[in-house]
Amino acid sequence: MTSFKLVKYIPRIKKKKSGLRKLARKVPTDRLLKFERVFKAQKRIPMSVFKAQRVLDEIRWRYYEETVMILNLMPYRASYPILKLVYSAAANATHYRDFDKANLFITKAEVSRSTIMKKFRPRARGRSFPIKKSMCHITIVLNIVKKS
């Protein structure tokens, strides 16, 4: 005969989702044109995912001009490659799709892990010490907003 343990059932407590996304969203989704978007991705940026995520959280759901102003004033090293990426995405939108930069809106800004560059540093007594430099992929999606 198999014996069973009686375990007291503990209900899971749901975490409250932060309201930052709702607060940061300034344009209702019905005003965003669904198929009028521009994707721009940059691969293998030599930067930690967490450092890039800190900057991307600030620019998500903002207009292009506001984003450029924020990125220029941010004191983080991660803001410069992201600024170049946003500039490039906006240039692609105006050149290839004839969008106006004043109506561009960042709907998606995400970062993902990439490869880790491994090097060795010489240490005392002929030993070596590994150095791991992490990299990341960053994707920006710009959407056009309808005039109201």
From Swiss-Prot:
Principal place of residence: plastid
Keyword annotations from UniProtKB, A to Z: Chloroplast, Plastid, Ribonucleoprotein, Ribosomal protein, RNA-binding, rRNA-binding
GO biological process entries: translation
Keyword Plastid: yes
Claim: Translocase is one of the keywords in the record: no
Pfam families linked to this entry: Ribosomal_L22
Listed GO MF terms: rRNA binding; structural constituent of ribosome
PROSITE patterns: RIBOSOMAL_L22
InterPro entries: Ribosomal_uL22, Ribosomal_uL22_bac/chlpt-type, Ribosomal_uL22_bac/org-type, Ribosomal_uL22_CS, Ribosomal_uL22_sf
Cellular compartments annotated: Plastid, Chloroplast
GO cellular component: chloroplast; large ribosomal subunit
Quaternary organization: Part of the 50S ribosomal subunit.
HAMAP family found in the cross-reference section: Ribosomal_uL22_B
Biological role stated in the UniProt entry: This protein binds specifically to 23S rRNA.
Entry similarity comment: Belongs to the universal ribosomal protein uL22 family.
PANTHER family in the record: CHLOROPLAST 50S RIBOSOMAL PROTEIN L22-RELATED, LARGE RIBOSOMAL SUBUNIT PROTEIN UL22M
Name of the protein in question: Large ribosomal subunit protein uL22c
Organism encoding this protein: Triticum aestivum (Wheat)
